Amino acid sequence: MILYFFNTLILNFLSKIIMAYKPNMEDIKNLRTMTGAGLADVKKALTESEGDFNKAMEIIREKGQAIAAKRSDRETSNGCVLVKAVEGFAAIVALKCETDFVANGADYIKLTQDILDAAVAAKAKSLDEVKELTIADGTKVQDAVVARSGITGEKMELDGYNFIEGDNVEVYDHMGKHTLCTMVQTNKAAQEQGHAIAMQVAAMKPVALNQESVPQSVIDEEIRVAVEKTKQEQVQKAVEAALKKAGINPAHVDSEDHMESNMGKGWITAEQVAQAKEIIATVSAEKAANLPEAMIQNIAKGRLNKFFKESCLLNQEFIQDSKLSVADYLKAADKDLTVVDFKRFTLAAE
């Protein structure tokens, strides 16, 4: 009786092994095409689901979620940035990951392109809206990103999205490296000039279109910094002049560390250090209390104008001809031609 029982168990076990689903090459190929998952993951998912493609896809998706959760604190400093324009709409999408090896992979670039295509087709107005879109294979964008994270084992995040609505938009992928993209919209059709300005935006990093579009809070902060810097420079000049008059090299006493180091080298005496400290304290206080306000404001205004020239697109020197501003370059092509909007996204820390 006992022998019969064990024989039955063994036979049942063997029959399950014999009858167990074994994924064939066609199923493996189809699921890999659908998910982009690795060979081992596809085989395992098909086996566990006994050939049920929907269950297998869910297994792969859950694995991606688990990996993404484990790596949520990782830094994503690499990725893929792509840009696209169609009639009436243009957008930039940035999908970030941990390493350039993954970022440069064909599957990763394709996923970024699929997301961009969906965003442009839907004329999406926000990153949250993009995440809820469906890409060409029927997968929701956020699910596709999580799945790719599971496949590569890296944290991934859809981190950047910009758009311009309207016509006359030229786009630029800097050096075709998919790390910096720009869009420029002109007030009338001007493909050559638009492309040139898109390159300008990539190289010169403007923060505003023109002086009028700079927020007042930014202007106020620039003035504050310019005034403070000007005051510090005026005080420093007075201190250096007083030190030189006393026969002390300002470079030898510009910090406590230098004072100690230079005394050890015999370049300056303890008495000179004491004298220098007294000069620095006295002259700094006197000069700071008697700075001419009109002069300070004039110098600060000059620095603000320099900020506008460097940071406002239309005020910038044109990179292809430094004798012209961007506005002048556009007017040379057409007296009414100008830029009405621009966007820029880069993976680089700037």
Model segments located where?
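Short, Lys/Arg-enriched N-terminal segments with co-localized hydrophobic residues
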Residues: M1-I18
